[in-house]
Each structure stands twice: as structure tokens, then as C-alpha cells.
Amino acid sequence: MNKETKLQVEAIKNGTVIDHIPAQVGIKVLKLFDMHNSSQRVTIGLNLPSSALGNKDLLKIENVFINEEQASKLALYAPHATVNQIEDYQVVKKLALELPEFVSDVFECPNSNCITHNEPVASNFRVFEKKGDVRLKCKYCEKVFSREIVTER
């Protein structure tokens, strides 16, 4: 693609840009941060061309800045995403994504027999890596699930 035919997504003055989200994951990230209910302008790019990923998703959220805790939750969905905080059209901070040790009240336990489905308790998982794969262990039923299984729900 040359510069004349390349489409660009409009820059934002202030807010957060989440780039390099794997294709088909952008909508999940949007819901994770409840951005779909925001009164702020949200720009969504789905299945955009990417030399590194083939296709990628992109989110730009005006006047909203995600914090380190939110970035660690994002790492479960998109471990290689980049998060840039923008002020006056300039990148002022890049957040490093690191897996959290624990994640609570974000995901539903895939085990249909888990107590979290029938009792008013928040889900709670311990997050760890095993042979390069991210796994989550439910605090209540103690079952271990791959990241993909837990985040697809």
C-alpha cells in the first residue's frame, strides 16, 4: 500500500489507544472495560491489516485513561497489545502489559458445577504460566483452564 491509498484512523486529542489487539478480540476488550456504554467517543478498528499479526483490532477511547490494574486484565485477552496514553495528540505514557497474579469478578468459571454459578460470590482465578501457556485456576472449584477457554465466555 502506498501513502495515497492507505487509510488512517483519526488521531485523538486525549485518551487511550489500545493497538495490536489480536483480530476478533477487540469487541471483548471493549466490553471488558465497559467502553460500549461510555458517553465518550470510541473509535473501533476491526480486522485492520498488520504486518506482525496479519490482522489486528484497534481501540481509541477519548478522555478515558486505563490504569495499571486494567492493563493487567487486558494482558489476559491481548498479551502483546500496546497501550498508549495520549495528551494533546502526543503519546505521554506507554503501559506495559503484565499478567496479574489474580483476577476477580471478570470472568465466569467454565466449570458448570462451580459454586460461582449458584451462589452470590465473585469469580476468582489465580493466573500462572505453564510451558508458555497462560492458565487460570478457579479459587472455588480448583479446576485449571487455558486463557482461551476462560476469555471466550
From Swiss-Prot:
Cited SUPFAM superfamilies: Aspartate carbamoyltransferase, Regulatory-chain, C-terminal domain, Aspartate carbamoyltransferase, Regulatory-chain, N-terminal domain
Gene3D superfamilies: Aspartate carbamoyltransferase regulatory subunit, C-terminal domain, Aspartate carbamoyltransferase regulatory subunit, N-terminal domain
InterPro entries tied to this protein: Asp_carbamoyltransf_reg_N, Asp_carbamoylTrfase_reg, Asp_carbamoyltrfase_reg_C, Asp_carbatrfase_reg_C_sf, Asp_carbatrfase_reg_N_sf
GO biological process: 'de novo' pyrimidine nucleobase biosynthetic process; pyrimidine nucleotide biosynthetic process
Alphabetized UniProt keyword annotations: Metal-binding, Pyrimidine biosynthesis, Zinc
Keyword Zinc assigned: yes
Cofactor binding remark: Binds 1 zinc ion per subunit.
Cofactors: Zn(2+)
Binding site for Zn(2+): C109, C114, C138, C141
Superkingdom assignment: Bacteria
A GO molecular-function descriptor: metal ion binding
Any Gene Ontology CC annotation: aspartate carbamoyltransferase complex
Family designation: Belongs to the PyrI family.
NCBIfam families linked to this entry: ATCase_reg
Assembly behavior: Contains catalytic and regulatory chains.
Primary role: Involved in allosteric regulation of aspartate carbamoyltransferase.
Name of the protein described by the UniProt record: Aspartate carbamoyltransferase regulatory chain
